[in-house]
Amino acid sequence: MKLTLNRILFSGLALSILFTLTGCVGRDAHGNPKGMIWEFLGKPMSYFIDYFANNAGLGYGLAIIIVTIIVRTLILPLGLYQSWKASYQSEKMAFLKPVFEPINKRIKQANSQEEKMAAQTELMAAQRAHGINPLGGIGCLPLLIQMPFFSAMYFAAQYTKGVSTSTFMGIDLGSRSLVLTAIIAALYFFQSWLSMMAVSEEQREQMKTMMYTMPIMMIFMSFSLPAGVGLYWLVGGFFSIIQQLITTYLLKPRLHKQIKEEYAKNPPKAYQSTSSRKDVTPSQNMEQANLPKKIKSNRNAGKQRKR
């Protein structure tokens, strides 16, 4: 059940990213971008792409790469903060596994839906008692802050005048590129593989779907859009790898050491449920009520005496 839920979540995420990118910026009747995100973020990015391409004489391909590097560098701290929150929750869950294991076992061995729900409620209470928030590692606010930048850069790479008629290293930026799509898929597959190396074997089994979902999603989006947008995804893939390397080899080891020291001073204790379990043993009165009543054999005896 948990694995199926993960597959649904990651598949939904893969499909929603493209819709989110296109949804942050509106379009007018002629299909041109419009709206606040475009005016305050997209237009300046488009201006700098045009500046590096024409005024600096670098060409539109290199201009897209430079502007994407600048934008991704600015929002990298938000991505790292999001990774830090997720890693912190993950490390705490790993240390508290012996505490939650008996409750998880009861969930699996539940004989009825009521027993399962009661155990799940107890698990959530135990997680709260130990400072665990299952959704706390998602970090919605940093992601929401990043999405307008992603969306603005996406449209700037697609709609800046001159991009569609330019080439970069023999690649037509106005057309789809199979070579660029293959490179992008390889980058995001490597990033997914790195993320798998940072988790336990049990979590790795549950995350297998994600390892293939992201590259497949990037293949779909990159090959469906002009190569100019593909350059944006290409640079984004390198930054995703950089962020994952920092998370795997810097953040997680430090968090592991920190949490280990915390629990060495204050070892986690088994969770004691405050609510007593409901006694489902039938009482003596209930047993007697459920017994079949004896048929009175002398029910007509009184009538016969009166005769």
Curated annotation (Swiss-Prot):
<dbReference type="Pfam" id="PF02096">
    <property type="entry name" value="60KD_IMP"/>
</dbReference>
<feature type="transmembrane region" description="Helical">
    <location>
        <begin position="58"/>
        <end position="78"/>
    </location>
</feature>
<keyword id="KW-0732">Signal</keyword>
<feature type="transmembrane region" description="Helical">
    <location>
        <begin position="231"/>
        <end position="251"/>
    </location>
</feature>
<feature type="compositionally biased region" description="Polar residues">
    <location>
        <begin position="271"/>
        <end position="288"/>
    </location>
</feature>
<keyword id="KW-0472">Membrane</keyword>
<protein>
    <recommendedName>
        <fullName>Membrane protein insertase YidC 2</fullName>
    </recommendedName>
</protein>
<feature type="signal peptide">
    <location>
        <begin position="1"/>
        <end position="23"/>
    </location>
</feature>
<keyword id="KW-0653">Protein transport</keyword>
<dbReference type="GO" id="GO:0015031">
    <property type="term" value="P:protein transport"/>
</dbReference>
<feature type="region of interest" description="Disordered">
    <location>
        <begin position="263"/>
        <end position="307"/>
    </location>
</feature>
<keyword id="KW-0564">Palmitate</keyword>
<keyword id="KW-1003">Cell membrane</keyword>
<comment type="function">
    <text>Required for the insertion and/or proper folding and/or complex formation of integral membrane proteins into the membrane. Involved in integration of membrane proteins that insert both dependently and independently of the Sec translocase complex, as well as at least some lipoproteins.</text>
</comment>
<feature type="compositionally biased region" description="Basic residues">
    <location>
        <begin position="293"/>
        <end position="307"/>
    </location>
</feature>
<dbReference type="GO" id="GO:0032977">
    <property type="term" value="F:membrane insertase activity"/>
</dbReference>
<feature type="lipid moiety-binding region" description="S-diacylglycerol cysteine">
    <location>
        <position position="24"/>
    </location>
</feature>
<keyword id="KW-0813">Transport</keyword>
<feature type="transmembrane region" description="Helical">
    <location>
        <begin position="209"/>
        <end position="225"/>
    </location>
</feature>
<feature type="transmembrane region" description="Helical">
    <location>
        <begin position="179"/>
        <end position="199"/>
    </location>
</feature>
<dbReference type="GO" id="GO:0005886">
    <property type="term" value="C:plasma membrane"/>
</dbReference>
<dbReference type="GO" id="GO:0051205">
    <property type="term" value="P:protein insertion into membrane"/>
</dbReference>
<dbReference type="InterPro" id="IPR023060">
    <property type="entry name" value="YidC/YidC1/YidC2_Firmicutes"/>
</dbReference>
<feature type="transmembrane region" description="Helical">
    <location>
        <begin position="135"/>
        <end position="155"/>
    </location>
</feature>
<dbReference type="InterPro" id="IPR028055">
    <property type="entry name" value="YidC/Oxa/ALB_C"/>
</dbReference>
<dbReference type="InterPro" id="IPR001708">
    <property type="entry name" value="YidC/ALB3/OXA1/COX18"/>
</dbReference>
<keyword id="KW-0143">Chaperone</keyword>
<keyword id="KW-0449">Lipoprotein</keyword>
<keyword id="KW-0812">Transmembrane</keyword>
<keyword id="KW-1133">Transmembrane helix</keyword>
<comment type="similarity">
    <text>Belongs to the OXA1/ALB3/YidC family. Type 2 subfamily.</text>
</comment>
<dbReference type="InterPro" id="IPR047196">
    <property type="entry name" value="YidC_ALB_C"/>
</dbReference>
<feature type="lipid moiety-binding region" description="N-palmitoyl cysteine">
    <location>
        <position position="24"/>
    </location>
</feature>
